[in-house]
Amino acid sequence: GVQRHLTLHRFRPGSEPMFPPIFAQYGTYHTASKAPFRRISFNDAMETYGSDKPDLRIDLTVQDATKLLSGCGFGPFEGNVVKAIVVTDFAGTRKQIDGLCAEVEVQSGNKGYWFRYDENGEIVGGIAKFVAPIKDEAVKALGLVPGCFVGLTAGKKLAAQKTAGVFRNKLGAFCPNHMDKEKYKFCWIVDFPMYEI
């Protein structure tokens, strides 16, 4: 009879070498990551990229900032999971930042927050007044360097992760130095839960 189930482990090895040349020849870009593709667990993908379909062309990652910021006095962070995306060499204007945050809210249904660690080593903009009193802790915990932008999301764990994933994608597309737009990068997401809580 016909085999009804094709497990990922059976499918992966034979199929991996087929993808890169097909995408390189017929896709928009002419470069694709070679087999074997990276394996990322569902939980790691959600924690690191905020998505179970991560765009690996973007070099930005999501960090957990709950311990650092949940008690900073900013209402939306209280009692919630807080996620952060640190973007070095960020040159966006206030108007552009507002635009990015608006896009994040439209796409995810949740607000994005932010602050900057400026060239003078000061916390400025967005929710800076809540973060400035813990500047030293923030610099250490998030690995901040002068001239960086920090995008923030908050909510129940899955909502904070997914909103951070949207924010990460928007920031990657906005910052050409953080996204390699001229290639395909493949991965396998493994160990999916049976359902999301």
Residues covered by each model-derived region:
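Class II aminoacyl-tRNA synthetase catalytic cores and aaRS-like
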Residues: 1-197
